[in-house]
């Protein structure tokens, strides 16, 4: 679609999705990209650039006393909004501790909350997640919370004051895409806060499916960082998100069991 | 001899670390062979705000954590 054309039903003239508003902030891109698992800073920077993202997730870890190497030292912090995660935390207390350290690191009040329940699946601990969400919101944090695809938990997290609820499409890093589109649709229908699909994206079509379901955005890391060509995959993810966003608003056709001719059935030669 | 008695052990990022008496948090951070983007310091599970790094003196047996921002998803 050219930039001079107008999307029906939308007063804006554009060829990209509208910006995403979360709490009191607006982000130009709905694709949130993780900064983990890159082999080198050059590839990371090129992939982030190709993805068009504004929000990048980061982790808080002990400094490596034996090596000063840190890819993030080469990240252009002026260009991106850093969203610290609590990855690796298996209880609410540890997650809250990481959020407070993040604040001390100068990263502000925005956090991606993860309280994990199991090392093999990395699925969230719903009880610890809810507890940490409540406490962090009370402490003034803006909490974007990683959740399972359970619609009841998603509602509880919204009630606890989450800025965004981020259900997993499938387990973190699994590349299985969207496994339970029914549950995700229910979550999307029920919640008022923006829902971002987080985790499990394997390839571009997964992002499109998430957006077609009605997600406000997608967060991914391994799908890009682990691809053979991360920069090309980042490019694909960006366009997949746009495709899904437009498709969700375009009004798709109904599915039918049998064919329906696309060309006129009248005036066929030989009849 | 006196040097020896002026040194003591702390836990730094989970490992035993020797420091001189009267070392401040700021001294410790500056002595580390690291070039982090930013650091935050915890002393015995309590954050030491950056504004207090210079005046906070580390004591024997303290558990010090020095953390930074790294790549993550």
Residue ranges and their predicted role:
Chain B
Residues 1-72:
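Ubiquitin-like/PB1-type beta-grasp interaction modules and other compact soluble beta-rich domains
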């Amino acid at each position: 679609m050219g930039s001079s054309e107008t999307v029906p039903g939308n007063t804006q003239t554009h060829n990209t999705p509208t910006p995403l508003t979360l709490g009191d902030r607006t982000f130009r891109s709905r694709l949130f990209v993780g900064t983990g698992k890159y082999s080198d800073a050059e590839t990371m920077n090129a992939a982030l650039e190709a993805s068009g993202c504004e929000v990048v997730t980061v982790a808080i870890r002990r400094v490596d006393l034996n090596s000063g190497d840190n890819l993030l030292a080469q990240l252009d912090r002026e260009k991106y909004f850093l969203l610290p995660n609590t990855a690796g935390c298996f209880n609410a207390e540890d997650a809250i501790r990481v959020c407070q350290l993040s604040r001390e690191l100068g990263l502000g009040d925005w956090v991606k909350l993860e309280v994990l329940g199991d090392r093999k699946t990395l699925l969230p601990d719903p009880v610890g997640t809810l507890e940490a969400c409540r406490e962090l919101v009370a402490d003034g944090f803006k909490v974007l919370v990683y959740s399972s695809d359970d619609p009841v938990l998603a509602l509880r997290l919204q009630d606890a004051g989450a800025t965004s609820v981020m259900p997993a499409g499938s387990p973190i890093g699994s590349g299985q895409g969207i496994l339970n589109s029914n549950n995700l649709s229910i979550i999307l229908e029920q919640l008022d806060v923006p829902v971002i699909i987080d985790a499990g994206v394997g390839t571009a079509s997964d992002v499109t499916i998430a957006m077609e379901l009605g997600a406000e955005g997608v967060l991914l890391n391994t799908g890009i960082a682990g691809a053979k060509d991360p920069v090309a995959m980042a490019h694909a993810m960006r366009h997949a998100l746009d495709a899904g966003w437009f498709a969700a608003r375009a009004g798709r056709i109904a599915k039918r069991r049998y064919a329906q001719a696309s060309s006129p059935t009248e005036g066929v030669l030989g009849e | 001899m006196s040097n020896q008695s002026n040194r003591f052990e702390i836990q730094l990022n989970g490992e035993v670390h020797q420091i001189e008496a009267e070392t401040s948090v700021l001294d410790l951070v500056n002595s580390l062979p690291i070039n982090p983007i930013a650091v935050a310091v915890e002393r015995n599970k309590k954050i030491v705000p950056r504004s207090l790094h210079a005046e906070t003196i580390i004591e024997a047996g303290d558990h010090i954590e020095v953390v930074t921002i790294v790549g993550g998803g």
